[in-house]
Every structure is written in C-alpha cells, then in structure tokens.
A protein has these predicted regions:
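Structured, helix-rich domain cores that form ligand/interaction pockets
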Residues: 2-16, 27, 70-293
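Short basic helix-loop element that most often maps to the first helix and adjoining turn
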Residues: 19-38
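Conserved hydrophobic/aromatic packing and binding residues within compact polymer-binding modules
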Residues: 21, 35-36, 46-49, 295
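Residue-level detection of beta-strand scaffold positions
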Residues: 32-35, 50, 63-64, 68
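Recognition helix of helix-turn-helix/homeodomain-like DNA-binding domains
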Residues: 40-56
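DNA major-groove recognition helix of helix-turn-helix/homeodomain DNA-binding modules
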Residues: 57-74
Length: 295
C-alpha cells in the first residue's frame, strides 16, 4: 500500500513520494487538518511530513494513504453517520456540552420545552441537547442527518474524529440509544426494484423475517413519464426491532427536494443500517475497536 504511487512502475523515493502524496491530497480537495484527523495525527505533524522536516516511515505511509483514499472523490461507496442519539446519566448539561461536545453553551439557544418527555433543551443549528430534572432521564444528545453534518464541522475544527467523540461519550457513561450508519452508492451498484422483486420471490436469504417496499413516484410533479417506477424504498426487518435496513433511491429524493436531475445526482442509492439500544452500543464498540487497531 505504501508503494501505491509509482512512476513507470518504479517505486518513488521518500521525497518523490511526499510530493506525489501532497499533490494527490490537493487533487482530492482535502485540507491538512481534515486528513490529519482521519489519520489520527496532528495537523502540525502532517505539515512537517509534507515539508520533509521529519522522516516518513513505511508504517506512516500506509496510514496516510489509507486515510487519503477515504476521501477519493471517485470511490463508488462512502460511509457516514446519519443519526446519533446518546443518553448521559447526569444532570450536568454544562459538562456534556463543554467536555463531550466541546461546544460553548453561551452560543446555544435555550428553550424551556423538549421532546421525548424532556422539559428543556439547548440547540445550535441542528444539534440538540435535552435535559430534565428527572435523574433517570439525564441528558440526551440528538443529531439527525443535518445535525451530524454540522457536528462534523465542529469535530474538524476541534481536530477530533467521530471515533474520538464516541470514545469520549462512552468513557463518560454515555448510553447509545440509536445509531444510523449510511452507505452512499455513487455509481448505481444497487438495483433497488430488483432487490424488492427478489424479496417478494423469497430469493433473499436473511435472518430478517419481513420486508416492506414503497414507491414514491406520485411525489414527482415534473415531466418524467414513468412516475410509477420512481423512488423505490425497501425496508428489510421489522421497523420495531433494534436493527433493520433501509435502502432507497437517493437520486430521486435529491430530484424531488433540490431539483437535481436524476442522472446528475452525486448519490444514486443509499443503504442505511438503523440500530437501537444494545445493537447501537455493540456497533459503536466494534467501530472503535477497528479504529484502534489501525492507529
């Protein structure tokens, strides 16, 4: 892996490798800070590597290349966190916001009402933190899709990754209530209508005993002729269980919401793994274990 960059089949020396690596990083449109966070090193250390002020080991080359390829704009699949809900067994909301989220509570808006039977909440953008005088409820963090994307910007500024944040949350006693992982299909690898048909024909081998499918073509009000065949969504597993899958044609969603032509949509399909309670906890534990192995 460390010899990924070559000229005419000849392995590059360290100086050439560093230059080629820096060029590829810029080509991908990735900042030093963003790449350093993904690689688990400081931005300063990466800067010193790219300026040849420190030697780069073979092990470091592998780590940097693996991190860089996660930002490859031509990658057919990308993964992201799409929903996070964590309960903290404390009434000290200031501690959660300051030490776990590493945000400034003074810049958050306070409302004296909440959801999930909480009595009040603080929010900034789509990042919500609920609290209640009930000790059993504690403090609840909720990040939906937009909230996850916004929180990623804060994590980047903090030079932290999702794995750093989740580790901090679990160490502080955080209890995973829900976690959605989304895999974006950028090339149309999945044929959702075909998957739906295979489920109907009992050609799908799975531990899940149920599936549901929906077609949302009636929502499209433009000139498309084949409305009935548009916008397929497939659920595998019971929506009431602690784990189920949702697969849908993201390109149609982007067309309906944003008016992006279907053929130009950057994401063709999305595969979501929705996990609750213990299933969410074990998924986070496994993700953290894998991230530690690669550090």
């Amino acid at each position: 892996m460390s010899q990924f960059f070559r000229k005419g089949g000849i392995a590059l020396n360290d100086t050439e490798w560093i230059q080629d690596f820096a060029d590829r990083r810029l080509q991908y449109g990735v900042s030093q800070t963003k790449l350093a966070v993904m690689a688990g090193i400081s931005r300063e250390h990466l800067s010193r590597i790219e300026s040849s002020k420190v030697a780069v080991t073979e092990e470091m080359k592998v780590k940097l290349l693996e991190a860089l390829e996660k930002f490859n704009p031509e990658a057919p699949l990308t993964m992201l966190f799409d929903y996070v809900r964590i309960r903290f067994p404390t009434l000290d909301i200031g501690h959660i916001i300051k030490d776990i989220l590493q945000l400034n509570i003074q810049y958050m808006i306070h409302e004296d009402f909440g959801h999930y039977s909480y009595t009040e909440h603080y929010y900034i953008g789509d990042i919500f933190v609920y609290t209640s005088p009930d000790e059993e409820k504690g403090v609840l963090l909720e990040l939906k899709g937009k909230g996850c994307r916004q929180f990623e910007s804060y994590l980047l500024a903090q030079e932290r990754s999702w794995y750093d944040f989740l580790m901090d949350a679990l160490v502080d006693g955080g209890v995973m209530k829900r976690l959605d992982l989304a895999i974006n299909d950028h090339t149309g690898m999945l044929d959702i209508p075909e998957l739906t048909e295979k489920c109907r024909n009992e050609e799908c081998v799975s531990v899940f005993r149920s599936f549901k499918s929906y077609a949302s073509g009636e929502l499209v009000k433009h000139e498309e002729q084949d409305k009935a065949g548009m916008g397929y969504t497939l659920y595998i597993g019971s929506l009431k269980s602690e784990v189920y899958f949702c697969v849908y044609e993201k390109s149609y969603e982007q067309y309906i919401k944003l008016g992006i032509p279907i053929e130009e949509a950057p994401i063709k399909n999305r595969f979501e793994i929705r996990l609750k309670n213990e299933r969410a906890y074990y998924a986070v534990r496994d993700l953290l274990t894998l991230s530690l192995i690669h550090i």
